[in-house]
Amino acid sequence: MEDIIKTLPQHTCSFLKHRFTLYKYKDAWNHQEFLEGRILSEQKFKAHPNDVFLASYPKSGTTWLKALAFAIITREKFDDSTSPLLTTMPHDCIPLLEKDLEKIQENQRNSLYTPISTHFHYKSLPESARTSNCKIVYIYRNMKDVIVSYYHFLRQIVKLSVEEAPFEEAFDEFCQGISSCGPYWEHIKGYWKASLEKPEIFLFLKYEDMKKDPVPSVKKLADFIGHPFTPKEEEAGVIEDIVKLCSFEKLSSLEVNKSGMHRPEEAHSIENRLYFRKGKDGDWKNYFTDEMTQKIDKLIDEKLGATGLVLK
């Protein structure tokens, strides 16, 4: 593994005072742990037709999507007062392909087909995942808010203040396509193109639409992943209960998400609270200059205009 990594193009992020390094492997940038997970999954992961992937670019609503999916598939065992989400961080409830291959394989052996989360580009997914007709849920978000959220997440991980980490430099790197799991537009475009060929196995969810009116999206998600709500459940308000349980306000207020650690056994563990910054859209307006806005709008039109996805 180390021999492969040594040969790859690399970039140390200037806005993070060179404390974070990305490696380019097959046209996508990743930090070392995700890169190792990608290579390992290419070699060892075998998809099952019952697998469901929850795919996203980082900071696009991943935590929320994982919480919703987990609450949906476990609602027969737990309600909103007994759910493991009350004591367990969402990222620890659903395995990540980049990091939890052994757990995923164990689940498959035991016929426990829980969703599998991933930040991989579509073409970076193991071949079996792309050829076995697994269902794929893809959540996407306004690119401007993604940049702001990504910036804060990384600078807090490496323990830099806003003053120490220039946002302008983060913005410029992102626009060059240099970001974790970037380029961002290639990430979205890859899943979108694949959905044109196999629309029946893809569900696209827009973060902003979900925030505005979550119930229809949650119902659509449950139908798609094979756990539809019954008319009786809908009448009883089960969907609304799940929406409340998985809301930013609820999850961010839980002790586990205020003081716990994600993957505490690892050298690069992350504070759970860093996954819960604001949970709203439009925060980019507090950071972007008019020039930045014009630049990013032009970039979105050039790179993603053909998709028809609204990312501004």
Curated annotation (Swiss-Prot):
Assigned EC number: 2.8.2.25
Keyword Transferase: yes
Compartments, as annotated in UniProt: Cytoplasm
pH dependence per the entry: Optimum pH is 6.0-8.5.
Any one GO molecular-function label of the UniProt entry: flavonol 3-sulfotransferase activity
Catalytic reactions on record: quercetin + 3'-phosphoadenylyl sulfate = quercetin 3-sulfate + adenosine 3',5'-bisphosphate + H(+)
Primary localization class, coarse: cytoplasm
One Pfam short name: Sulfotransfer_1
Cellular component terms per the entry's GO annotation: cytoplasm
Keywords of the record: Cytoplasm, Transferase
Enzyme class: transferase
The keyword Protease is assigned to this record: no
Activation and inhibition: No requirement for divalent cations and insensitive to p-chloromercuribenzoate, iodoacetate, or iodoacetamide.
Phenotype when changing R277 to A/E/K: Reduction of activity
Matching Gene3D superfamilies: P-loop containing nucleotide triphosphate hydrolases
Similarity comment text for this entry: Belongs to the sulfotransferase 1 family.
Subunit record text: Monomer.
Role noted for this protein: Sulfotransferase that utilizes 3'-phospho-5'-adenylyl sulfate (PAPS) as sulfonate donor to catalyze the sulfate conjugation of rhamnetin > isorhamnetin > quercetin > patuletin > kaempferol >ombuin > tamarixetin, but not quercertagetin, gossypetin or myricetin. O-sulfonation of position 3 of flavonol. May play a role in auxin transport.
This protein's name: Flavonol 3-sulfotransferase
Species for this entry: Flaveria chlorifolia (Clasping yellowtops)
